[in-house]
């Protein structure tokens, strides 16, 4: 009952008590937003630019990213920097991280925002993983790991570095099955929705474990449900499903609110390993996401998948 109630109640959150106007001055802060060319990511970049941050917009499509950068400059007067990143290819992930590290010594905030939802089952990552789990969890894990030197360089006891990972209310709907994330007979028995749920559950497990491992080194790691948001994530849904779902969806600027709160507010900076819910509130993820044994198992599995890349 608790998981079901959490899922349903977060579809209809109360009016926010925090807004982008409450974001502190971010002058001198270096930030990366994955999937920053569209939806919640783009709105996140917009708010960060408006408050003085130096923002790297990480995306797969250079054309779409540069269109977004041009539009955002018109709206804010500030220009984001394109960072080439395909989370579905671990080689591209390393290349993107190395490009960033060649330009910056410090990274103050990393928004692991990009995601794939309900992709067709025949879609796999470059290395043969389920596209959803590979993009949402494995790609972001590898990217975060490679950027740890810059995060640690930016982190101090009074100004901690932050890693904010976007999950969803889907984290309440299931747990992890380590046997279905690579193309296999076991995976073929699963539905796309189940694999999406696992990826969102995995986002929270990863975020909690990151806090557990690096909290003492002044890195804050939170995950969140951005809310029921109208974005490109729904591109794999049928027209009928899109139309039905549209009734319950909020605009992308609302979807950026909770991750901006997690990533910039003094309140969220006093916490670690938490799960945030719409709009800009502290919540609770599914209980299993906080299990240290599960966190350790997932972390070690992810390290094994990424070690050759």
Swiss-Prot record:
Superkingdom: Eukaryota
Active site: 167 (proton donor), 196 (proton acceptor), 200 (lowers pka of active site tyr)
Keywords: NADP, Oxidoreductase
Pathway: Secondary metabolite biosynthesis
EC assignment: 1.1.1.-
Any one Gene Ontology molecular-function term assigned to this protein's record: oxidoreductase activity
Applications reported: Melleolide sesquiterpene aryl esters are cytotoxic secondary products with anti-cancer potential. Armillaridin shows therapeutic and radiosensitizing effects on human esophageal cancer cells. Armillaridin induces autophagy-associated cell death in human chronic myelogenous leukemia as well as of hepatocellular carcinoma cells. Armillaridin can also inhibit the differentiation and activation of human macrophages and thus might have potential to be developed as a biological response modifier for inflammatory diseases.
Pfam families for the chain: adh_short
Binding residues for NADP(+): 64, 86, 113, 196, 200
Further facts: Armillaria species are both devastating forest pathogens and some of the largest and oldest terrestrial organisms on Earth. They forage for hosts and achieve immense colony sizes via rhizomorphs, root-like multicellular structures of clonal dispersal. One genetic Armillaria gallica individual localized in Michigan's Upper Peninsula stands out as exceptionally large, covering hundreds of tree root systems over approximately 75 hectares of the forest floor. Based on observed growth rates of the fungus, the minimum age of this large individual can be estimated as 2500 years.
Main function: Short-chain dehydrogenase/reductase, part of the gene cluster that mediates the biosynthesis of melleolides, a range of antifungal and phytotoxic polyketide derivatives composed of an orsellinic acid (OA) moiety esterified to various sesquiterpene alcohols. The first step in melleolides biosynthesis is performed by the delta(6)-protoilludene synthase PRO1 which catalyzes the cyclization of farnesyl diphosphate to protoilludene.
Similarity section: Belongs to the short-chain dehydrogenases/reductases (SDR) family.
Protein name: Short-chain dehydrogenase/reductase ARMGADRAFT_1018437
Organism: Armillaria gallica
């Amino acid at each position: 009952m608790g998981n079901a109630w959490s899922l349903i109640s977060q579809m209809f959150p109360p009016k926010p008590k925090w807004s982008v106007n409450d974001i502190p001055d971010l002058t001198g802060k270096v930030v990366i937003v994955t999937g920053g060319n569209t939806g919640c990511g783009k709105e996140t970049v917009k708010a960060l630019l408006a408050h003085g941050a130096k923002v790297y917009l990480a995306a797969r499509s250079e054309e779409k990213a540069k269109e977004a950068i041009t539009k955002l400059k018109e709206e804010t007067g500030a220009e984001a920097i394109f960072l080439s990143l395909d989370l579905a290819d671990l080689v591209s992930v390393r290349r993107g991280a190395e490009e960033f590290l060649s330009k910056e010594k410090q990274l103050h905030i990393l928004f692991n925002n990009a995601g794939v939802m309900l992709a067709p089952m025949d879609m796999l990552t470059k290395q043969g993983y389920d596209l959803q789990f590979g993009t949402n969890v494995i790609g972001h894990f590898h990217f975060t790991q490679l950027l740890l030197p810059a995060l640690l360089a930016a982190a101090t006891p009074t100004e901690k570095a932050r890693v904010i990972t976007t999950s969803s209310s889907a984290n309440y709907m299931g747990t992890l099955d380590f046997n279905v994330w690579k193309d296999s007979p076991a995976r073929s028995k699963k539905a796309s929705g189940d694999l999406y749920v696992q990826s969102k559950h995995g986002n929270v497990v990863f975020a909690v474990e990151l806090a557990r491992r690096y909290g003492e080194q002044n890195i804050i790691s939170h995950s969140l449900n951005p809310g029921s948001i109208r974005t490109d994530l729904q591109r794999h849904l049928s027209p009928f499903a899109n139309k039905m779902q549209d009734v319950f969806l909020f605009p992308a600027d609302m979807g950026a609110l909770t991750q901006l709160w997690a990533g910039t507010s003094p309140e969220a900076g006093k916490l670690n390993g938490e799960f945030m819910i719409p709009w800009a509130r502290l919540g609770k993820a599914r209980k299993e996401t906080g299990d240290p044994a599960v966190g350790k198992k997932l972390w070690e599995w992810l390290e094994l998948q990424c070690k050759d890349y």
